[in-house]
């Protein structure tokens, strides 16, 4: 076994249930055994788990509930405790303690809360405790949800300072086409950079019963790889898959980490779910992508959403393509007022100014 590494393992609903309506406990037992074996060898393991709603539905005897957010949150509230009890029970067989962390998008958007979550997660790891992470589905609304556990796992990998992120699913990896519809589809074993062609392939693929399909796994891989974290998509049903990944054995699709990873602050900017969105003109797009310039108010065409100064926002071109994420120097209302104006007009329009740029290049990361 190699020197100690930190591995984040994301377990989707399709892996935990085997495609059924209930948790597949026999399979979860095997996954815990693999993790415990690595833990005993000195590796640090983080679990990102789905399955709270499935656990709640099973515990309540599959009640007939309306298809509403309130119903899902009811099931999550019941299932969350059942789920953590299951992880606790199974890891205790090996003398391993677990610690639960429930996160929402707000924990990632706010830099101080992000750092606090990081410190908590690393304290658990430093004390040989296995963190079990899930989104706080019992209280999270659409506005504060990360949205899927694929992207949550990438953020967890950044928080943990992980070496590898393993996304376990019901497929062997990323294929050249959806293997369920195209028998000629081939497994892509290595990816050295994510481009629009790969995104198009992932957009046509599906992955099990959960919130995230292959497209969200690609998003997660992009975030993690740019933070210097190797990411693997593999089948959760493959025997010994977790150990194989830690040994460097070829499994599924390996997304190779960026050779020069982002600095810590830019990892947060890149990984934080955007609080809003602005659309910029062709001149601003070229300045950002080709010259690495800051974004000036003059180049802003429209502002979407309500956000505060200091929050991370998405920057899109006129075609709607996501070209960058950055920390806004002004809130959404102020940006709407100064959009299309020259920087020297800011003070006259607002009665104050926080500098001539809307998003500074030091607070921006291109996609």
From Swiss-Prot:
Alphabetical list of Pfam families matching this protein: AA_kinase (PF00696), PUA (PF01472)
Transmembrane spans: none
Alphabetized HAMAP family for the sequence: ProB
Family matches, as Gene3D superfamilies: Acetylglutamate kinase-like (3.40.1160.10), PUA domain (2.30.130.10)
Function: Catalyzes the transfer of a phosphate group to glutamate to form L-glutamate 5-phosphate.
InterPro entries for this protein: AceGlu_kinase-like_sf, Asp/Glu/Uridylate_kinase, G5K_ProB, Glu/AcGlu_kinase, Glu_5kinase, Glu_5kinase/COase_Synthase, Glutamate_5-kinase_CS, PUA
Residues annotated for ATP binding in this entry: 10, 169-170, 211-217
NCBIfam families associated with the record: proB (TIGR01027)
Keyword Nucleotide-binding: yes
GO biological-process terms attached to the record: L-proline biosynthetic process
Keywords of this entry: Amino-acid biosynthesis, ATP-binding, Cytoplasm, Kinase, Nucleotide-binding, Proline biosynthesis, Transferase
Binding site for substrate: 50, 137, 149
GO MF entries: ATP binding; glutamate 5-kinase activity; RNA binding
Positions in coiled-coil regions: none
PROSITE patterns attached to this UniProt entry: GLUTAMATE_5_KINASE (PS00902), PUA (PS50890)
All residue ranges annotated as the PUA domain in the record: 275-353
Protein EC: 2.7.2.11
Family label: Belongs to the glutamate 5-kinase family.
GO cellular component, one term: cytosol
Cellular localisation: Cytoplasm
Name listed for the protein in its UniProt record: Glutamate 5-kinase
Cross-referenced PANTHER family: GLUTAMATE 5-KINASE, ISOPENTENYL PHOSPHATE KINASE
GN (gene name): proB
Lineage: Bacteria, Pseudomonadati, Pseudomonadota, Gammaproteobacteria, Enterobacterales
Pathway in which the depicted protein is active: Amino-acid biosynthesis; L-proline biosynthesis; L-glutamate 5-semialdehyde from L-glutamate: step 1/2
């Amino acid at each position: 076994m190699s020197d100690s590494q930190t591995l984040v393992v994301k377990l989707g609903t399709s892996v935990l249930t085997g495609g059924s309506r209930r948790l597949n406990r026999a399979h979860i037992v095997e996954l815990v055994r693999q993790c415990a074996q690595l833990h005993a060898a000195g590796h640090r393991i983080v679990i990102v788990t789905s399955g709270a709603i499935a656990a709640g539905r099973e515990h309540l005897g599959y009640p007939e509930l309306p298809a509403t957010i309130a119903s899902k949150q009811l099931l999550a509230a019941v299932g969350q405790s059942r789920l953590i009890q299951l992880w606790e029970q199974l890891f205790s067989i090996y003398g391993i303690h677990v610690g639960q962390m429930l996160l929402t998008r707000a924990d990632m958007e706010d830099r101080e809360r992000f750092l606090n979550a990081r410190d908590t997660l690393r304290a658990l790891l430093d004390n040989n405790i296995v963190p079990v992470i899930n989104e706080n589905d019992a209280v999270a609304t659409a506005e504060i949800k990360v949205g899927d556990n694929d992207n949550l796992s990438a953020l967890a990998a950044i928080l943990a300072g992980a070496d590898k992120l393993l996304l376990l699913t019901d497929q062997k990896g990323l294929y050249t086409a959806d293997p369920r519809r195209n028998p000629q589809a081939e497994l892509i074993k290595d990816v050295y950079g994510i481009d629009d062609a790969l995104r198009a392939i992932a957009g046509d693929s599906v992955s099990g019963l959960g919130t995230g399909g292959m497209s969200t796994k690609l998003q997660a891989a992009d975030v993690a790889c740019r933070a210097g974290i190797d990411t693997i998509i593999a089948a959760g049903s493959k025997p010994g898959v977790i150990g194989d990944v830690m040994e460097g054995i070829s499994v599924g699709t390996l997304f190779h980490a960026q050779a020069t990873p982002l600095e810590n602050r830019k990892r947060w900017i890149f990984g934080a779910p955007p609080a809003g969105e602005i659309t910029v003109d062709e001149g601003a797009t070229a300045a950002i992508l080709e010259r690495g310039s800051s974004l000036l108010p003059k180049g802003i065409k429209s502002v979407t959403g309500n956000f505060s100064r200091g929050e991370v926002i998405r920057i899109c071109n006129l075609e709607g393509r996501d070209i960058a994420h950055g920390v806004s120097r002004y809130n959404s209302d102020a940006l709407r007022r100064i959009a299309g104006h020259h920087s020297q007009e800011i003070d006259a329009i607002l009665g104050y100014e926080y500098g001539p740029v809307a998003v500074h290049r030091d607070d921006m990361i291109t996609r």
